[in-house]
Amino acid sequence: MLKYIPAIFAIILSSNIAIASKNYDYINATPLRQVADLIDSHITNIDHLFNNRLMFYESSSIKSKFITKDKQYVIIMEVPGFDKNQIKVKLNGKKLFIAGNIEEKNKANDSDNYMNKNFNYVISLYEDVDQTNISARLKNGILTIILPRIEVKEQDAKEITIN
């Protein structure tokens, strides 16, 4: 039973993603086919996780774009309604954390109105990102994060002695 927990967990986490897919054939999909497609998409995501150095992990539907240029990487995110005090960008090791949260509670006409809007991204950075000069700006609902690139010298291969 324990060996199935990761697959079950992955299916639960992404069920909303599969349902919202624009290219999914809902008419001809059977429940078994839907589960098989979901598992297949997770295997692909796991493959990307281990084979790509840069990977977005997202928990919301904020539109984002990653641009590679000669001297920098640029992350552009559409975050309408957020101001700079509601967005946090943090660097921890080789991971860049981007989070936004809006909570508003209004009492009008004897009724409680509550709104909560949030997003969370974790980005694994390439080796050539200059972590000391990362910058971010928010203008007209567009968050732009600049990741300057530096030249990375390849280390000489080191032979490991087998005992």
Curated annotation (Swiss-Prot):
Keyword Metal-binding: no
Classification via InterPro entries: A-crystallin/Hsp20_dom, HSP20-like_chaperone, Small_HSP
Keywords, comma-separated and alphabetical: Stress response
Keyword Signal: no
Family affiliation: Belongs to the small heat shock protein (HSP20) family.
Stated name of the protein: Small heat shock protein C1
Domain sHSP: 55-163
SUPFAM superfamilies: HSP20-like chaperones (SSF49764)
